Amino acid sequence: MSIKEHVKSMVKSVILLDKRRNRINMCNRAKLRNMEMSILSSNCAGGVMSHDLGLPFRSQFVNLALRPKDFVKYLRDLDYYNSLDVIFPEDVEPCWGGGQYPVGRVGDVTIHFVHYTTPEEAREKWNERKQRLNRRICS
C-alpha cells in the first residue's frame, strides 16, 4: 500500500469514527434530563463529557488534573476549598505529560492546570467556573 493510499484509508477511518461519535452524542443529548448539572471529574474527562453533551462548563475541574487523594479530599469539603484562593507556588513541578503548565494549590490540595499556559489564565478560568458550579445538585 502506498503512503497516499494509507493516508486516505486513515482519513476515511477518522471520518467514520467522528460520524459515529456524533450519532452517539446526539442520542445521549436526547436522553439528558438535567441541563443544569455540574460534572466533577479529577481530569479532562468531565470537560469532554460536558462538550459532547452540549453543556456549558459548570465546574472548575475542566482542563486540569488532580491526584485521586486530592480530588476526594476536595470533594469531601467542597465549600471549604471553594472558599479559598488558588495560589501558584514556585516549588511545585508539573508531573504529567512532560510539559510546562501551571501547578496550583488550594489549601493542601495540588491542582495541575495541564491545558493552560500561565497561572493568570488558570486562575481566571478556575474562578469563573467555580462560580458556575451548581451546588444544588452536588449536595
Task: Please annotate each region the language model reported.
Residues 25-32, 43, 48-138:
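Positively charged, amphipathic N-terminal segments that serve as targeting/anchoring signals
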Residues 1-35:
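Membrane-proximal basic amphipathic "stem/tether" segments
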